[in-house]
A protein has these predicted regions:
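Active-site proximal helix-loop segment of RNase H-like, two-metal nucleases, encompassing DDE(D)
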Residues: 158-180, 193-196
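Short, basic/hydrophobic alpha-helical segments
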Residues: 97-117
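Short beta-strand segments
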Residues: 29-31, 116-120, 146-149, 203
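C-terminal domain-tail junction helix/linker
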Residues: 180-226
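Extended, low-complexity cationic-aromatic segments
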Residues: 10-104, 212, 219
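RNase H-like polynucleotidyl transferase catalytic core
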Residues: 57, 62-68, 137-157, 173-175
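Acidic, metal-coordinating catalytic cores used for nucleic-acid/nucleotide bond scission
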Residues: 94-95, 118-130, 149-155, 180
């Protein structure tokens, strides 16, 4: 539990309860960025494994450890808690401007008239003047921001999905340039939504949730006693 945010328990409980029981009036997205995805390519191709047996002694696959680095890309994405589908985009940066692009993408994929609920970090790009201006220019859509406590990204389901992306797409991937990295990440998101998407379950533990609730109750009692 991280107490750097004095309202950690209250904010965390609010987020957990949203994840346990998503709003019924519109979709709930866990939103975040995965920055610094390496665009790199090994200087030599992989060598396949050699089967063991006469006359060969066999050996495992070999992978070149030297790479040519060609920068990085950033993924901005939202995990829809209601059904487990992912909506995202790959960019070279993840500023307020790109965050507004993500909001526009979520807007496009949500039926008219439904509010869009977002669970997200309280970082500057998520509540900047540029973002406020964008929201004011799109009054036809209501966005409801539910901010995580400080340093509590791990509460969000999008972090779980980012780990899936890393294991299944990025771990051994080679990208010659940013466009190829973008294509492969977008292809994985499409494949995931078609064949693997499912709602996640809260697995941090009932005891953890109860501990937070007890902390809030104890604080309330102290305030009443004062």
């Amino acid at each position: 539990m991280n107490d750097r945010d004095p309202e950690f328990a209250t904010k965390a409980v609010a987020v957990i309860e949203l994840l346990l029981s998503p709003p019924t009036d519109g979709p709930l997205f866990c939103v975040d960025e995965k920055p610094g995805i390496g665009v790199r390519q090994p200087t030599a191709p992989d060598q396949p494994p050699v089967p063991r047996g006469p006359p060969a002694r066999g050996r495992p696959a070999r992978r070149e450890f030297e790479y040519t680095r060609n920068g990085t890309v950033d993924l901005l994405a939202g995990f829809r808690v209601n059904d487990g589908r992912v909506c995202g985009m790959v960019r070279l940066k993840h500023r307020s401007r790109e965050f507004c692009e993500l909001l526009a993408l979520l807007d496009e994929q949500t039926p008219v008239g439904q509010p869009i609920h977002l669970i997200l970090d309280p970082v500057s790009s998520h509540w900047s003047a540029e973002g406020v201006t964008w929201l004011d220019a799109h009054p036809q859509r209501t966005f409801v921001f539910h901010f995580l406590p400080v340093h509590a990204s791990w509460l969000s389901f999008i972090e779980v999905w980012f780990s899936i992306l890393s294991r299944k797409c990025l771990r051994r991937a080679d990208f010659a340039d940013a466009s190829i990295a973008t294509q492969q990440i977008e292809a994985f998101m499409s494949t995931y939504n078609t064949h693997m998407a499912h709602p996640f379950e809260w697995k941090k533990g009932v005891r953890f949730y109860k501990r937070l609730k007890d902390k809030i109750a104890a604080r309330s009692e102290l305030q009443l006693a004062a």
